[in-house]
Amino acid sequence: MREPGRPPPIRTDDSNAFANNTMRVRLPAIIDQTIAANDDYPASIKERLSQLRGEIAAGARIHGLPDASSPDASDWAGALRRQREILNAEPTWHNVEWFFAETYAYRCLIDAVRWWESGRDPFLPVKREELNSERLWALLDHATEPTDSAAEALRRLVAFDLWANRIDLSYAASMERGTRIDEDDLLVDERGDLLAYLAKSAGGSRQFYGDGTIYLVADNTGSELALDLALSDCLLRHVMERVVICLKAHPTFVSDATPADVWMILAEMTARGGSAAALAQRLRAYWASERLRFLPQLYWNSSRFLWDLPWSLRNRLNIARLVIIKGDANYRRALGDCLWPAHTPFSQVMDYLDAPVLCLRTLKSDPVVGLPSAETAARLERIDPDWRVNGKRGLIQFKAQTSKSQQVAVAG
């Protein structure tokens, strides 16, 4: 469903080269890698994965889920029906909305490996590879070095949490770049607005928006999740009362974080000792006291855009002190996966959420808003035609509260 005034979502046909290539080449390659990484899968699972791979690459007709008893089956049936209504024809992998196609492809993969029965993460071998990388732990140590002030710690951690996206298991170009950052890679930096808001909300007047909870919509596990947890620790120590980390209910997009990934990385932090173990100890204490929560929901695996939230989740986010949206796929979900003019104000596009919003995103797909001017996008096109999709550039974008009707005053 598209909100009035929004451009139409990107499609998987040849109207968008990157989306079309994703379905023809990138996703089939990921399925091949999944088969290779799980050599002990029974032949029946490998056959189902190979069939799915072939159907996606060839642009075959999209079928409904075979198991109607799964908890999300009716939602996906409705999503497929909507694609059929939009097309007035049978949906194929190469003629539907891209966000639907990608999310549904991973849902079909989960069905093919019988995840609902086994709970076995088909992407675990790849996730463990990054978790065992010394680069991850060096990055975490560097990001959590002592600073002169809470504000400086937050400023540093927000930047590290953004650029940790460059180590993303489904995106080879980002892996090649590692964590090396050029100054002009950060296209928008609104950390100043964020820090001013957080300082005001924690100030002597005690006037602030929301209920004192930050919702962090997580993206990838590994380096990014480690930095999400470090940022949560900093916020809980210096600014906020509670942090809720929103997670995927089942594995998807290769590296997206689930509750199992959180506990796996906490165990690895503890085993590493030193500052990582101390961080894990604090995080476990926050969790025990319910200041830190992990909230998996099938919504985050769905093809729904962010304005199409379940009511219970919408109500929670709308009264949050801050909503942090992480990563490229969540950015696409927030924008409607469509091609706004790149200089469209971020606050205008996100005005459907009442709460203040922070987006941390490295660009790995075409949608982008909030650039300083139309000339910024034109200049980037001249110097780097792949600037929207190659994972090199990033955004730190902040929107203040949209509605003042929920302003909360707490007696000092």
Could you tell me what each predicted segment is?
Residues 1-211, 397-411:
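Non-catalytic accessory regions outside enzyme or core folds
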Residues 2-4, 11, 247-249, 255-412:
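C-terminal functional extensions of proteins
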Residues 96-100, 218-226, 250-252, 328-333:
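Gly/Ser/Thr-rich loops at beta-strand to alpha-helix junctions
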Residues 107, 218-222, 298, 361-364:
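Short, flexible loop/turn elements at secondary-structure junctions
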Residues 194-197, 234, 311-318:
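Short amphipathic alpha-helices and their capping/turn segments at secondary-structure boundaries
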Residues 213, 241-244, 356:
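Residues at the starts of beta-strands that form the adenosine-phosphate
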Residues 213-215, 321-322:
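Structural motif
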Residues 223-245:
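Histidine-anchored nucleotide/phosphate-binding helix
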